[in-house]
Structures are given as C-alpha cells and as structure tokens.
Amino acid sequence: MKNIRNFSIIAHIDHGKSTLSDRIIQICGGLSDREMEAQVLDSMDLERERGITIKAQSVTLDYKASDGETYQLNFIDTPGHVDFSYEVSRSLAACEGALLVVDAGQGVEAQTLANCYTAMEMDLEVVPVLNKIDLPAADPERVAEEIEDIVGIDATDAVRCSAKTGVGVQDVLERLVRDIPPPEGDPEGPLQALIIDSWFDNYLGVVSLIRIKNGTLRKGDKVKVMSTGQTYNADRLGIFTPKQVDRTELKCGEVGWLVCAIKDIHGAPVGDTLTLARNPAEKVLPGFKKVKPQVYAGLFPVSSDDYEAFRDALGKLSLNDASLFYEPESSSALGFGFRCGFLGLLHMEIIQERLEREYDLDLITTAPTVVYEVETTSREVIYVDSPSKLPAVNNIYELREPIAECHMLLPQAYLGNVITLCVEKRGVQTNMVYHGNQVALTYEIPMAEVVLDFFDRLKSTSRGYASLDYNFKRFQASDMVRVDVLINGERVDALALITHRDNSQNRGRELVEKMKDLIPRQQFDIAIQAAIGTHIIARSTVKQLRKNVLAKCYGGDISRKKKLLQKQKEGKKRMKQIGNVELPQEAFLAILHVGKDNK
C-alpha cells in the first residue's frame, strides 16, 4: 500500500489538465504510441468536439520512480467548468492528493481557487504545477507569486512543465510520489468501498467506479450495497489503464471498476458504500453532499410516441450524472415530458445533446428558470421551479428569489466594464481585493440573472480574461412577476416566464415582437399578447394571408365590392373561431434569446 498514490488533476478551464494526463499516460506506458491520441481520456465525442472535459475519468498506471521503486498511480482527470464542479468534488473524495495545474500565461483564475479550496476542505495534499511554460507569454515567476498571494499555498518551488511538449512532466511525477501521502486503511478489515461514479452499459448493466477504503474485494465475492441492503455478485472487476483491464482482486487503497450485473439503475447509487455480505462493515463511508440543481427546464419529446424511450434514456443518463434531477410534467401545449433540474446552462445543453445523440431523441426545451421560494397568504412556504406552478398573484404574500454569491477574478483594466455588467444584472458588491494587477470581486447577483447569460457577457466584456465561480447563498424577497403569453386569447403555459417587475415591460415587449417573427402567417389574424395577471402589457399581431377577392370586379360598383369584402370577413371570423395555431420549436427558444440582440 505504501507505493499507491491516488490523486486528481484539478484546474481552471483550458489550463491543460487533459493534455497533462495524456503525457503522464505516455510516460508510464499506459498506451502504445499507436493508440495514443490527443485528450485520450475525453472519450465522449461531445467532449472532443467542444474541447472540454465533462466526465471525470480514472486511470491506473505503474511508474518507475528515480528511487528505484515502482509506484501505482491512480489518477482522475476532472472537468474545469463550474457546471461540473460536483464531478470534481466526487473525484477528490477518492484521493489523498491533487495536482493543481495553473497556466503560466493566464495565472490563477476563479475555478483554480474554487477547486483548490474544495481539495483543502477535504484535507488533501495540493501540489501546484505551472503548465504551458513553452508559451511566449508565460511568466512563471509572476504566476508563482499569484498562487501564493491568492490561493495561499507555497509555490516557490512549484514544478514547471509544458504538457504539450512534455518538458518537465517527469519532474511532476517525481514530486507527486514524494509529496502525496499513500492511502490509509486496513487491508485485513471488513470491506468498505466507495462508489465514485457509475454508468450504464447495454451488455453488462451498471458499471461502477469504486475506491477501496478498507479490506479487499475479490472476483466472485458477494457484495452488499449498504443503503439498500441489496446483495449482488461481483462478476468482473478491474482497472482502467485507459483500457478496461480485468483483475482478480482490488486491494485496499486502489481505484477500479466493478460489474455486478445490476439491471436496476437505482441499484448502486453514487456515493454509497459497498461491503461484503458475509462480513459487513459497521459504518457507512461519508458519501457526497447532494448537489441541488440551480436551473430547471421542461424537456418534451417532439413526438409523443417517444415518451417511454425518453423516460428510459433519462434514467440511464441520471445514473451517470448524479446531479440530474427529473420529474414527469405535462403541458397543454407540448404534451407529456419531464421537468429536469441542471447545475447550469452548459450542463443543460450537454444533457440535451447527449439525449439527442446517444439515445436518438428529438426534444423541445422550455425556457430555463430557477427555484423561487413563495410564501402564500396562508403562510405556507412552497418552492416553485416552473412558472406554471406559481400561485395566483392575490395568493402570494411574498416571493423570494435565489441570490448567488459570485466570485470573479479579472485584470484591473476590465474592472469598469465588469462592474457595469454586474449592476445591470441587479448585483450588489460585497467585496473587492487587489492582488498585483488582478482584482478579486465578490458580488451578490440574483441566480436568475447569473444562469441566463451572465457568463457569456462577462467573458465578452473582459475579452475572455475574467473568470467566474458562483454558489447559492440565500433566498431574498424581491418584486418578481409572471409574464404570460396569450395567443389568440389562450395562455400558452410553456412560454410563461418569471422576471423582475422593472424588466417585465421590456421583456414582455421583446418576447412578443420576437414571437411575431417566428410564428408563420395563417389564414386569420393571430394576436400575441404578454400579460401580467389580467393586465396586458404588450401586443402584436401576425397579419392574415388573404385572397384578393376584388380581382374579378374590374370597374364595378362599390356596393358589389363591399359585399365581397364583407363575405370574406365573415369567413375569416368563422375560421378564427375554430382555427389552431401551430407553434414552431424556435418560438420556445425565443425566450432564451430575449434581450440578447439589442445589446
């Protein structure tokens, strides 16, 4: 056990985690040169296309150190985006140390800090690494000072490397072996294994990634899931050297995969503890804190026949993604679907794309909303995650919206722009600290503003230099209203949105104008209205298509023309009474883009 090292690689987006993993795999000979490709651990094609890591991946390698010993390295490559930070915290729970990768050109950014604090809270040894020293803009001296100044760990002798060219990666490994402590645990004690992650394989059933804390797990053992008390047979187990390799046993301190032929997707929840059926452990291992979704949206299959397939797909996906929340929902406009909870907009996009690709579904998404806390006049408190669940205006005593605490790091030059943006988003400044030429800003901004497009706008006002990390702080009373959209006098539940009263007039008008362009013209007038309660705040009309009934009249008497026009008018009126309006998918997406074009 003294030769095992478990560690994660944590860093801000694009600071070179996955590339560093590639080099480590190459040096330790996990894959032959022929099998090697860039970002070998980003196995999902979605990850490769966007150039981001979504799922944490684990690898077990053997490394022959300069002291002559061979060490077993179990390492986990983690995502950098704030939406996937739960992946990072889960990975860290399986480790004793973490490599904090910092780009020697960009310096410390918000995610660097957030991930580093997560690691420190779990009492992990954090080893700083300065990456990308081959860049002309690299300034390792300044960045080392920044790490000390902002993060507060000693970085004077931080390893310097370039993962792209491979310079200094050997030193990273030596430092790892030296600084990160070996796992603790009792190899002879009763088995305790933590489920770090799981996914569904169509042939094998549920595959779990586990970390053995105490005891040993052998092939053929009967294992028991501690939370449900279910027992299963350990059919196959092994490690990833990125490839799946079978082993006969997993020893104390190791990280590996396990297949128990579990068909039920809720059979082995992530964060649970496995133990042996014949010699069970007393205590459950501390799991992970449940992450609360921050953004909710309705997902509906385009054709209602896909509902069953959609339900199964969500089940399989939620096994792989513990933070996905879903419950059935029906809408008069869109039929049956699910209300899903996500950690952020990127997470929502990724889930939707994975459902469409991996499970071949066509989906419609409604506008994302956050959770509001509503105190009704009868003094009960309810949580509302969709505009249609909001009680009538006269039944609401107080409506509270979630406030996010946003930590931003940015160069001083962009401070003015960023403050303007935060104020526009109804933010309140709580803290501001200067570190060299970097500024650390803390704002409290309503969650609804943060999840919509705050991140994109922050990046564009600061030319990509500002970085953001946010977390939920509290609920705060606020003057929010629900804007309904009426089409020919009928409410369309899927188009409603909750917004601040000050913005409601503008949001309503923009939405109505946008819908006008998107709804195709029909044989009768379509009135599109935005309303708060019964009060109409905006309206526009999609004009009807009409035939020129006077074309055959040539000269003709005025009364003849009037008769024809009157007849047409009556026909249109009858049509309007029975006519239905088809809404295209773009109309539902219009809500997302309200307020984007006029900036």
From Swiss-Prot:
<dbReference type="GO" id="GO:0003746">
    <property type="term" value="F:translation elongation factor activity"/>
</dbReference>
<dbReference type="GO" id="GO:0097216">
    <property type="term" value="F:guanosine tetraphosphate binding"/>
</dbReference>
<dbReference type="GO" id="GO:0003924">
    <property type="term" value="F:GTPase activity"/>
</dbReference>
<dbReference type="InterPro" id="IPR038363">
    <property type="entry name" value="LepA_C_sf"/>
</dbReference>
<dbReference type="GO" id="GO:0043022">
    <property type="term" value="F:ribosome binding"/>
</dbReference>
<protein>
    <recommendedName>
        <fullName>Elongation factor 4</fullName>
        <ecNumber>3.6.5.n1</ecNumber>
    </recommendedName>
</protein>
<keyword id="KW-0997">Cell inner membrane</keyword>
<dbReference type="Pfam" id="PF06421">
    <property type="entry name" value="LepA_C"/>
</dbReference>
<feature type="domain" description="tr-type G">
    <location>
        <begin position="2"/>
        <end position="184"/>
    </location>
</feature>
<dbReference type="InterPro" id="IPR006297">
    <property type="entry name" value="EF-4"/>
</dbReference>
<dbReference type="Pfam" id="PF00009">
    <property type="entry name" value="GTP_EFTU"/>
</dbReference>
<dbReference type="GO" id="GO:0005525">
    <property type="term" value="F:GTP binding"/>
</dbReference>
<feature type="binding site">
    <location>
        <begin position="131"/>
        <end position="134"/>
    </location>
    <ligand>
        <name>GTP</name>
    </ligand>
</feature>
<dbReference type="InterPro" id="IPR035654">
    <property type="entry name" value="LepA_IV"/>
</dbReference>
<dbReference type="InterPro" id="IPR004161">
    <property type="entry name" value="EFTu-like_2"/>
</dbReference>
<dbReference type="Pfam" id="PF03144">
    <property type="entry name" value="GTP_EFTU_D2"/>
</dbReference>
<comment type="similarity">
    <text>Belongs to the TRAFAC class translation factor GTPase superfamily. Classic translation factor GTPase family. LepA subfamily.</text>
</comment>
<dbReference type="InterPro" id="IPR005225">
    <property type="entry name" value="Small_GTP-bd"/>
</dbReference>
<keyword id="KW-0472">Membrane</keyword>
<dbReference type="InterPro" id="IPR000640">
    <property type="entry name" value="EFG_V-like"/>
</dbReference>
<keyword id="KW-0342">GTP-binding</keyword>
<feature type="binding site">
    <location>
        <begin position="14"/>
        <end position="19"/>
    </location>
    <ligand>
        <name>GTP</name>
    </ligand>
</feature>
<keyword id="KW-0378">Hydrolase</keyword>
<dbReference type="GO" id="GO:0005886">
    <property type="term" value="C:plasma membrane"/>
</dbReference>
<dbReference type="Pfam" id="PF00679">
    <property type="entry name" value="EFG_C"/>
</dbReference>
<dbReference type="GO" id="GO:0045727">
    <property type="term" value="P:positive regulation of translation"/>
</dbReference>
<keyword id="KW-0547">Nucleotide-binding</keyword>
<keyword id="KW-1003">Cell membrane</keyword>
<dbReference type="InterPro" id="IPR031157">
    <property type="entry name" value="G_TR_CS"/>
</dbReference>
<dbReference type="InterPro" id="IPR013842">
    <property type="entry name" value="LepA_CTD"/>
</dbReference>
<dbReference type="InterPro" id="IPR035647">
    <property type="entry name" value="EFG_III/V"/>
</dbReference>
<keyword id="KW-0648">Protein biosynthesis</keyword>
<dbReference type="InterPro" id="IPR027417">
    <property type="entry name" value="P-loop_NTPase"/>
</dbReference>
<comment type="function">
    <text>Required for accurate and efficient protein synthesis under certain stress conditions. May act as a fidelity factor of the translation reaction, by catalyzing a one-codon backward translocation of tRNAs on improperly translocated ribosomes. Back-translocation proceeds from a post-translocation (POST) complex to a pre-translocation (PRE) complex, thus giving elongation factor G a second chance to translocate the tRNAs correctly. Binds to ribosomes in a GTP-dependent manner.</text>
</comment>
<dbReference type="InterPro" id="IPR000795">
    <property type="entry name" value="T_Tr_GTP-bd_dom"/>
</dbReference>
